[in-house]
């Protein structure tokens, strides 16, 4: 049977399943952060505020998140071993991710925005490696794959939410057009 708990397993499985599903929320953080930039870079106010960046600079702004994610994913195992899985996730969101979001939201120049993208990527990389690790180590084996797969689903939900928020703010004639989508990431971090 599908998702049938083994009869010889002792204890309640539902607390671990709920915690694992909640941890999947980190995927929204990842997907939303990845998805916001595609809409933001086309917003008229953002283009004017950031001195009409050329294609090379746009490529840097978009891809620097992946550089941070790469570095974060490499460091995630070490951090998780030092701080523990749960605290590793919490610290990854509180420190590098929130710093990156703050820098992006406050930025009025390309270098600060690029630095913010890197630090947000660092936090996303740390989280994206630690959450599946945490889920895999805490969930019962009979449900583990489905719950870890929910993390991937949450990435897609995050991309969808980013598209909605970008669409809703794109025609604002002020910095709120790009700052609102960026600042909403604080809410995702707070929830996680």
Give the positions of each predicted feature:
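Transmembrane-helix signature of 12-pass secondary carriers
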Residues: 1-192
């Amino acid at each position: 049977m599908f998702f049938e708990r083994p009869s010889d397993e002792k204890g309640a499985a539902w607390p671990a399943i709920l915690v694992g599903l909640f941890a999947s929320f980190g995927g929204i953080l990842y997907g939303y952060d990845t998805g916001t930039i595609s809409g933001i870079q086309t917003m008229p106010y953002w283009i004017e505020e950031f001195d009409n960046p050329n294609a090379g600079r746009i490529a840097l702004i978009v891809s620097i998140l992946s550089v941070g994610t790469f570095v974060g994913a490499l460091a995630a195992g070490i951090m998780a071993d030092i701080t523990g899985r749960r605290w590793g996730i919490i610290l990854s969101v509180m420190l590098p991710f929130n710093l990156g979001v703050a820098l992006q939201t406050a930025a009025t120049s390309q270098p600060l925005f690029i630095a913010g993208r890197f630090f947000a990527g660092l936090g996303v990389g740390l989280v994206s490696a630690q959450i599946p690790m945490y889920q895999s180590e805490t969930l019962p084996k009979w449900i583990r794959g489905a719950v870890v797969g929910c993390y991937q689903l949450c990435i897609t939900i995050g991309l969808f939410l980013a598209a909605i928020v970008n669409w809703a703010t794109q025609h604002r004639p002020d910095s709120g057009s790009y700052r609102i989508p960026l600042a909403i990431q604080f809410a995702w971090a707070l929830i996680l």
